[in-house]
Amino acid sequence: MSVVFALATPASRSALCVFRVTGAGCLDCLPDIFNLAPEKPRTFYNRLLVGSDGVIDSVGVVFFEGSNSYTGEDSFEVFAHGGLAIMNSIVGLFEEIGFDEAGPGEFTKRSFLNDKLSLSQAESVSDAINATRKDVLKVALNSLAGGFAAEVFGFADRVDGVRKFVEGSIDFSDEDYDFINDGGVVESLEVLCADFGGFVSSCYVSAENESKKSVLFVGPPNSGKSSLFNRLLGFDRALVSDSAGTTRDLIESEVFYNNSSFGIIDSAGIRKTEDKIEKDGVELALGKIKKADVVVAVFDSEDVAMKNELAALALDKPFLTVLNKIDLDVAGDEGVFDFALSAKTGAGISDFKNCISNLFKHTKVGDQKYFARSRHVRLFDSCLTSLQDSMIKIKAGEDLDLAAEDLRLARVSLDDVVGVKTSDSLLGDIFNDFCIGK
C-alpha cells in the first residue's frame, strides 16, 4: 500500500494542527525534512520542518515502527501551529515527496487489514467519535476494547463445536457412536440459542448516529433568527445585521446540550422579494420545513398570517413559536407564543433549550454492555434463525445435511460481524462514514 497522509484536525485556523502519515517507507523522509534520524520511536522530538522553499514551521514529531503503530505500518505524526499557510505548506510538501492524500477512515481501515483491529472494533472507533452521550460512549469503548469481538468469536467456536457432531453423524453414520444424542447436540443448541439471545440483549442498538435530528429557525426577516442561532451555539456563526435579508442561504451547525445532540439551521427571512438570490433563499427555507424534525418560528411581533402559514407547512412535526427581542419594546403579546426570550441578553433561553433537548431525549443504555450497529443486528438475527432452524431439523430427525448447512450459515453470519471475510464494497460502506485522518 502507498504512503498516505491526512490532516487529523479541522482545516481551520487554530492553536495546533496534527498531520498523520502511514505506509511502508514513510520514515525515510525524516532525515531530510526534519533533520531527524529515527532512533527512538514513540518519543516526542522538536524539530524545524523544512521544505524546498525553506523552513515551514517549528513542529513536534513522533514516529512509530511497524506493528507498534495504530495502522500496523511505519507511521509518524506532525504537530504544527494551526495556521492556514502552515497547513497548506505541509500538504504541498507531502505531495511533493510523493505521499497520497488519505481517504475517509484510511488509517483505521489499514489497522483492520493489518490485523490490528477486528472489523467490529474498527466500527467502534467511528461509534466512539460520533457518540454524543456518555452512556453511548461507554458501550462504544467497551466494543473498541475488544469485548464485543471476543464474545462473537466465542459463540462462533461454540457453533463449530456443535457442528462437528452433526458432521460426524453424517460422515460416520455406520459407527456405533450416536453423535447426536451422545454428543448432546440438541441440549447444546438450546443453551447456545439462549446464551446468544442474552448476548444480543446486552448490545445497545442506536440509530442516533445514523440520522441527526435537526431544528430549523424560520420567520420574517430581521426577527433575530441568526442571533438566536448564535446564542445556542455560544459563538457567532451566522452574520447578524440590522438590514433585512442578510441571511440568504441555510447555515447549519451542531449543538450538544443536556446530554442531547441536535443540528440547528438558520434560514433566510421569509418575505416577498424581487431579489433573485434572496428569493432562492426563501424557497430553500420553505422547502427545508418538510425535512426538519422541529420547526421554530421566530418573530419580533405578532404575525398571525405567517404563523399559520408556517404551521401548515410543518404538518404534524413539533412547531414552536418564539417571541424574540423582549429586551426591547416589542409589539407582541407574550401569551400567544410558546416562548418569549431575548437572544441578545439570554433571557428565557434556558427554558427554550431545555424544551428542544427534551424533544430529542434518547432511551438510556441501562445495563447494556456493547454498541451494535444495524448491520450487526441483521447478522445476529440471521445467526439465531439458522441456529433455531438447525435445532428444529435435528429434533424432527430430518436430513442432517440441511441442519449442518444451517450451522455453517450461523457461523458465516458471526464471521461477517467481526470481518473474518469481507468484501471490498462492505469495507467501502463502513469506512466511507469515517472522518479524514482516522
Cite the ranges covered by each PLM segment.
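C-terminal-of-GTPase-core extension/linker across diverse P-loop GTPases
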Residues: 2-11, 134-256, 273, 291, ...
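Inter-motif core of Ras-like GTPase G domains
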Residues: 278-301
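Switch I (G2) and immediately adjacent beta-strands of P-loop GTPase domains
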Residues: 46-65, 245-273, 294
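A glycine-rich (often HGG/GG-containing) alpha/beta subdomain
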Residues: 1-138, 142, 146, 320
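Generic detector of well-ordered alpha-helical packing
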Residues: 75-78, 250, 267, 301, ...
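Generic enzyme active-site microenvironment
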Residues: 264, 298, 322
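Conserved nucleotide-binding/hydrolysis micro-motifs of P-loop NTPases
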Residues: 12, 24-25, 65-69, 83-85, ...
